[in-house]
C-alpha cells in the first residue's frame, strides 16, 4: 500500500507541470486575442467617423490606439515635409532681409556723404545769407560832379603851363562820363583827313559837338589852333609847333614839354611778316650809330670805333646821299645795339630799332620817349649820358645773351602794341589820356551771344539725368553751392595807379577797362577770420581730406567756373558729356557753342543742376571756342571738347590748381615741340618735359579769350579757320608769349580718347602735318617761338601718401 502511494505521487508531479504550461499557453493566447481585438477596427465604426476621431486628437502619442502604424508614418512624413517647406521659405526670407540689410549698410556711407553735402550746402547758404545781409544796405548812387575850380583865362603869352592841371578842366570830365571826345581838323590836308578817320573809328565815346566833350582833339599840319581852350589836344602831323605857352597838349615828334606826348605820327608801318626774327642772336654789326646832328664834333665818336671787337662798330655821318630811310633801316636791322642821339630823326630811328630788334642805346638822360610815364622803357632800352660814350662798348658787351633777347622781345611787343600803325597809336593816345584823367571806359559788350532756341538759351525740354551723384567712392568733392558770378569791373580806378604798371608793361592792354584782372592782389591768409574781411571766403577747417572737401579754401574768395563746350555733329556724345557734369561742385554754368550751322538742335537735352545755355554762331569756326561771350560770368573758364571723359575729381583738382596759377593754362593732355634737323615739329609722344596743354580739357582765364579774339595777330585766327585745326596751339603760343611761363599739367592723363566717337579731327591723316606747319607759321608771325618747357605736373598734396587710419586723402585717385 505504501508503494502505490509513492508511485502515485511521482506521476502526479509531471501532470501538474503540463497543466501549468497549458494554463500559461491559454493565458498567452487569450492575451493575444484580446490585444488584437482592442487594436482592430470594429465593423460598426465607419471610416468617416474614424477620420473625425483622428482629426480631434490633440496628442498623437496619447491616442495612438486609434491609428495604424502606416497612417502614423504617413502623417509624420506630411508634417516633416510641411516643416521643411516652412524652413525653406523662412531661409529665403532671411536671405532677402540680409540682402536688404547689406544694401542699407552699403548705402550708409553714401547717405552720410549726401548728408555732409547737404550740410555743406546749408552752411554755404547760411554764409551767403549773412553776406547778403551785410551788403544789402549799401547805397548805390552816381558820384558827384567834379569841383569847378575858378580859373583866369590868361592869354598864352602871359603864362606857361607846367603841369597837366594847368590845361585840364576836370569839371568837364566826370569819372562817370566815360571821357567823351570830340575830334576835328584845323588844316585840310590828306594826312589830316586820314587821321580824322582813324580817330573816328577808334574813339569809344565820340561826340559831335565840342561843348559835350571832355577832350577835344584838333588835327593840324604845323599850325597852332587860333582858339586855345582847356582840355585841347593838338595832334600835329607836320613840322613841330614851337609854342611853350600853349594851353593845348601837343602830340608831335619834337619841341615838347613834360606833359606833351612825344610821338612820330608819320612813322611808316611795315607788315608784321617782314619783321626781323629775334633769333639768331648774332648780327653783322655789334653797334651802329647814325650822327645827324652837325653841331656835334664827329671826331668825338672816333674812340668808340677804335674799340676792339670781333664784330664791326659802324658809325655813319648822315648826309642827304647816305641817310635815306631804306639805308637807315638796313643798318639798324643788321646791328645788335643802335646808339641813338637826340635829333629830328630820333623817333624814326627809335621806332625802327624796336621794330627790327636792335636794342636802342639812348645817349641822353633827357630825351623823352613815347608815353614814358606809363611805358617802362627800361625793359627794352638802355640810357647813357653822352659823356659815357667811350665806356659804352664795355657796358653793352657785358649784357647776357638772355637779357639782350628779352630786350628785343619786349621792345618788339611795345612797338606792336602801342606804336605799329595809326590805329594803335590813336588808341594808345586815348588810353594815356584816360589814365591821366582817371576815367574808366564804357562797358562794351562786343560778344553778345545769340540764343540757339529762338529767344531762349536753354532747351525747351529737359530729360532727367539718371547718373547718380559722383562721390568718388566715399570721397566728397565739395558742396553744391548756389551759383555765384565773379565780381566784374572791380578795378575800374585802381587800374590807373596800383595796376597801371601791369596794364601797360605786363599784360599790355590798357585800352579798355577790364572786366576781370588776372593777377589781382590777394588778402593775407588770416583775412578769412576777421569780421570785416571774411566775406566770400570759405576757409578749410584743420584736418585732412574730409575737412578739405567741405570748403574751397585757398587764398581768394569763393568762385566758380564756366564750362565752354564746343560741339559739332555729335549729339549723342554731347549728351553724355553733359550728363557727366551733373552735380559737379563749383560749376556755375555750361555754355554749348553749337557749331552745327546747317541744322537746328533737338529740343530735349539733359536737365542739370545748373543752366545749360546753347549759343548760335555764324560759321563752323574753331575760334568760336575762345570768344569771350558775354554769357561767361566767371573768371575761370573750362574749355572742353564734347568727346572728353574726365572724372569729376580730376576737374576739381585742376580748378583748385588754376586758382593758384591764374595766369597760366592748367589742364590734362600735354604735348611738346621738338626739333628734328632744321625744322620744328609738334610732338605727342610721351616725354619728361612738355610745353603745351591741349585746350580740349583746360582751365583758362577769360581775359585770355579776349586777348585771343582781339589782340592776337589776326593772321593766326585766319589760319586756324582755314585749316580747321591748331586753335589749341595758338592759345598756348599766346599765353606763353604774354606771360613767359609754361602751362601746368595735372594728373597722369596723357590722352583723352573717346571710344564711342566715330569721327575726330585727330584721326585725319593730315592732322599732324597741319600742326607741324602751324608751329612754324606762328613762330614766324611772333618772330620767335614763345613756348616754354615744364618738367613737372601737379597732383594733390596727399596723393600717394601713407596716412593714419583716421585720416583721408584730398582726392582718392589724383
UniProtKB/Swiss-Prot annotation:
UniProt xrefs under InterPro entries: Exostosin, Exostosin_GT47, GT64_dom, Nucleotide-diphossugar_trans
Compartments, as annotated in UniProt: Endoplasmic reticulum membrane; Golgi apparatus membrane
Binding residue positions for UDP-N-acetyl-alpha-D-glucosamine: 570, 595, 620, 625, 641-643, 727-728, 771
Pathway: Glycan metabolism; heparan sulfate biosynthesis
Binding-site list for Mn(2+): 643
GO BP terms in the entry: embryonic morphogenesis; heparan sulfate proteoglycan biosynthetic process; nematode pharynx development; protein glycosylation
Cofactor(s) it depends on: Mn(2+)
UniProt similarity note: Belongs to the glycosyltransferase 47 family.
Biological role stated in the UniProt entry: Glycosyltransferase required for the biosynthesis of heparan sulfate. Initiates heparan sulfate synthesis by transferring GlcNAc to the (GlcA-Gal-Gal-Xyl-)Ser core linker (GlcNAcT-I activity). In association with rib-1, is also responsible for the alternating addition of beta-1-4-linked glucuronic acid (GlcA) and alpha-1-4-linked N-acetylglucosamine (GlcNAc) units to nascent heparan sulfate chains (GlcNAcT-II and GlcAT-II activities). Required for normal ventral epidermal enclosure during the early stages of embryonic development.
Listed name of the protein: Exostosin-like-3 homolog
Native source species: Caenorhabditis elegans
Amino acid at each position: 500500500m505504501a508503494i502505490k502511494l509513492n508511485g502515485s505521487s511521482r506521476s502526479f508531479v509531471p501532470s501538474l507541470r503540463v497543466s501549468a504550461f497549458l494554463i500559461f499557453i491559454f493565458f498567452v493566447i487569450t492575451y493575444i486575442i484580446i490585444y488584437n481585438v482592442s487594436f482592430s477596427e470594429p465593423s460598426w465604426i465607419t471610416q468617416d467617423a474614424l477620420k473625425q476621431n483622428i482629426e480631434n486628437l490633440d496628442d498623437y502619442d496619447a491616442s495612438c490606439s486609434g491609428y495604424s502604424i502606416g497612417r502614423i508614418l504617413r502623417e509624420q512624413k506630411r508634417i516633416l515635409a510641411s516643416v521643411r517647406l516652412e524652413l525653406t521659405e523662412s531661409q529665403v526670407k532671411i536671405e532677402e532681409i540680409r540682402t536688404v540689410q547689406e544694401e542699407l549698410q552699403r548705402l550708409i556711407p553714401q547717405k552720410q556723404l549726401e548728408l555732409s553735402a547737404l550740410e555743406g550746402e546749408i552752411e554755404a547758404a547760411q554764409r551767403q545769407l549773412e553776406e547778403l545781409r551785410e551788403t544789402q544796405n549799401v547805397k548805390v548812387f552816381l558820384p558827384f560832379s567834379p569841383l569847378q575850380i575858378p580859373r583866369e583865362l590868361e592869354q598864352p603869352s602871359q603864362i606857361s603851363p607846367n603841369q597837366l592841371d594847368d590845361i585840364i578842366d576836370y569839371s568837364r570830365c566826370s569819372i562817370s562820363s566815360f571821357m567823351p571826345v570830340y575830334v576835328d581838323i584845323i588844316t585840310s590836308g590828306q594826312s589830316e583827313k586820314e587821321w580824322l578817320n582813324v580817330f573816328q573809328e577808334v574813339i569809344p565815346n565820340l561826340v559831335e559837338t565840342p561843348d559835350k566833350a571832355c577832350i577835344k582833339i584838333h588835327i593840324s599840319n604845323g599850325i597852332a589852333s587860333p582858339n586855345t581852350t582847356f582840355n585841347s589836344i593838338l595832334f600835329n602831323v607836320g613840322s613841330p609847333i614851337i609854342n611853350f605857352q600853349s594851353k593845348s597838349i601837343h602830340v608831335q615828334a619834337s619841341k615838347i614839354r613834360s606833359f606833351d606826348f612825344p610821338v612820330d605820327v608819320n612813322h611808316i608801318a611795315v607788315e608784321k611778316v617782314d619783321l626781323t626774327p629775334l633769333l639768331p642772336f648774332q648780327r653783322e654789326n655789334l653797334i651802329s650809330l647814325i650822327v645827324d646832328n652837325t653841331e656835334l664834333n664827329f671826331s668825338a665818336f672816333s674812340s668808340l670805333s677804335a674799340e676792339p671787337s670781333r664784330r664791326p662798330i659802324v658809325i655813319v655821318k648822315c648826309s642827304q646821299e647816305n641817310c635815306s630811310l631804306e639805308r637807315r633801316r638796313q643798318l639798324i636791322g643788321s646791328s645788335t645795339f643802335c646808339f641813338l642821339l637826340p635829333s629830328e630823326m630820333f623817333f624814326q630811328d627809335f621806332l625802327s630799332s624796336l621794330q627790327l630788334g636792335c636794342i636802342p642805346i639812348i645817349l641822353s638822360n633827357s630825351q623823352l620817349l613815347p608815353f614814358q610815364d606809363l611805358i617802362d622803357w627800361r625793359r627794352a632800352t638802355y640810357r647813357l649820358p653822352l659823356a659815357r660814350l667811350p665806356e659804352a662798348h664795355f657796358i653793352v658787351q657785358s649784357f647776357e645773351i638772355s637779357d639782350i633777347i628779352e630786350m628785343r622781345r619786349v621792345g618788339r611787343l611795345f612797338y606792336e602794341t602801342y606804336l605799329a600803325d595809326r590805329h594803335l597809336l590813336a588808341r594808345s593816345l586815348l588810353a594815356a589820356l584816360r589814365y591821366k584823367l582817371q576815367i574808366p571806359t564804357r562797358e562794351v559788350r562786343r560778344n553778345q551771344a545769340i540764343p540757339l532756341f529762338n529767344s531762349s538759351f536753354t532747351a525747351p525740354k529737359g530729360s532727367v539725368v539718371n547718373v547718380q551723384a559722383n562721390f568718388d567712392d566715399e570721397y566728397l568733392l565739395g558742396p553744391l553751392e548756389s551759383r555765384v558770378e565773379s565780381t566784374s569791373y572791380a578795378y575800374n580806378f585802381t587800374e590807373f595807379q596800383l595796376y597801371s604798371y601791369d596794364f601797360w608793361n605786363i599784360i599790355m592792354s590798357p585800352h579798355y577797362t577790364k572786366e576781370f584782372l588776372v593777377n589781382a592782389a590777394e588778402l593775407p591768409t588770416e583775412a578769412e577770420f576777421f569780421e570785416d574781411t571774411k566775406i566770400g571766403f570759405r576757409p578749410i577747417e584743420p584736418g585732412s581730406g574730409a575737412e578739405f572737401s567741405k570748403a574751397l579754401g585757398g587764398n581768394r574768395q569763393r568762385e566758380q567756373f564756366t564750362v565752354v563746350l564746343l560741339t559739332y555733329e555729335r549729339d549723342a556724345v554731347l549728351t553724355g558729356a553733359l550728363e557727366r557734369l551733373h552735380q559737379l561742385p563749383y560749376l556755375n554754368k555750361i555754355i554749348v557753342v553749337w557749331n552745327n550751322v546747317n541744322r537746328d538742335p533737338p529740343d530735349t537735352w539733359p536737365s542739370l543742376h545748373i543752366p545749360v545755355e546753347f549759343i548760335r554762331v555764324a560759321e563752323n569756326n574753331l575760334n568760336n571756342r575762345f570768344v569771350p561771350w558775354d554769357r561767361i560770368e566767371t573768371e575761370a573758364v573750362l574749355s572742353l571738347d564734347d568727346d572728353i571723359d574726365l572724372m569729376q575729381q580730376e576737374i576739381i583738382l585742376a580748378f583748385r590748381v588754376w586758382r593758384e596759377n591764374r595766369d597760366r593754362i592748367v589742364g590734362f593732355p600735354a604735348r611738346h615741340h621738338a626739333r628734328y634737323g632744321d625744322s620744328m615739329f609738334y610732338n605727342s609722344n610721351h616725354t619728361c618735359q612738355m610745353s603745351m596743354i591741349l585746350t580740349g580739357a583746360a582751365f583758362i582765364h577769360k581775359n585770355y579769350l579776349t586777348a585771343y579774339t582781339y589782340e592776337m595777330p589776326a593772321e593766326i585766327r585766319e589760319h586756324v579757320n582755314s585749316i580747321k585745326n591748331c586753335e589749341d596751339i595758338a592759345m598756348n603760343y599766346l599765353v606763353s608769349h604774354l606771360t613767359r611761363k609754361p602751362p601746368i599739367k595735372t594728373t597722369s592723363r596723357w590722352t583723352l580718347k573717346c571710344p564711342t566717337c566715330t569721327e575726330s579731327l585727330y584721326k585725319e591723316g593730315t592732322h599732324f602735318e597741319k600742326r607741324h606747319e602751324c608751329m612754324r607759321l606762328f613762330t614766324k608771325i611772333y618772330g620767335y617761338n614763345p613756348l616754354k618747357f615744364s618738367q613737372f605736373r601737379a597732383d594733390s598734396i596727399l596723393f600717394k601718401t601713407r596716412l593714419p587710419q583716421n585720416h583721408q586723402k584730398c582726392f582718392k585717385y589724383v
